[in-house]
């Protein structure tokens, strides 16, 4: 059954909520300015949010490092140490550091840009050689593939192309049932941000959610996490209906714990309890 999942997005060492399409540059220590539109910048440490998810038993939450600033690593480690082996971590994960982050207490590592390489047409596409290698190294049960995407309308048809590099680079990889089935052989979950609506609080991409439910590989029910645009607790009911309970939903900027005015965290917790056989 569909459930609410939490997030902790970290940028320049702080927990933030950012409009997805505006994250155009890295937050390295040498970068003095940022073009990112920030909906929320927390004065609290990442551990505050990790403790909140722990206290209310919100399972499967992800910690995302939005840039290479070393302070992001410190904040991610602080969150992981607050609830060891229960939070997922992503951002800059590769073959060399995946096991390190598991050792730091992550339940899973989330793969994003590293998975993609240029093809013969000089376009980026998912590299199954890399995916197989890292899956073999750490085990598919510890691996999540981030397939966040942007909407592209071609000849009147809507496609969702996987986007990398802070969602600024559109790859040659298109989401489909066949593609998700192929990737699912090497990982435990999918994380899919709808980058065009991320952080806007103007509604979810309902057609994408519906398609994800239809495309869901056997055994991946409740292992696809959608993020982007959630603005009401009713979005959980919508996602449950559209995906037939197969897709989970993340809330960010609309949530009161991130100074949002639209959704109460405790209401989402209660929704999970009322709609889950395991809670």
Swiss-Prot record:
Its Enzyme Commission number?
5.3.1.16
* Catalytic reaction annotation: 1-(5-phospho-beta-D-ribosyl)-5-[(5-phospho-beta-D-ribosylamino)methylideneamino]imidazole-4-carboxamide = 5-[(5-phospho-1-deoxy-D-ribulos-1-ylimino)methylamino]-1-(5-phospho-beta-D-ribosyl)imidazole-4-carboxamide
Annotated GO CC locations: cytoplasm
Where is it located? Answer: Cytoplasm
GO biological process: any one? Answer: L-histidine biosynthetic process
Task: From the record, give the cysteines joined by S-S bonds.
Answer: none
Query: Which pathway does the protein contribute to?
Result: Amino-acid biosynthesis; L-histidine biosynthesis; L-histidine from 5-phospho-alpha-D-ribose 1-diphosphate: step 4/9
Superkingdom of the source?
A: Eukaryota
Give UniProt keywords alphabetically: Amino-acid biosynthesis, Cytoplasm, Histidine biosynthesis, Isomerase
Gene Ontology molecular function, alphabetical: 1-(5-phosphoribosyl)-5-[(5-phosphoribosylamino)methylideneamino]imidazole-4-carboxamide isomerase activity
Q: Which family does it belong to?
A: Belongs to the HisA/HisF family.
PANTHER family documented for this protein: 1-(5-PHOSPHORIBOSYL)-5-[(5-PHOSPHORIBOSYLAMINO)METHYLIDENEAMINO] IMIDAZOLE-4-CARBOXAMIDE ISOMERASE
Q: What is this protein called?
A: 1-(5-phosphoribosyl)-5-[(5-phosphoribosylamino)methylideneamino] imidazole-4-carboxamide isomerase
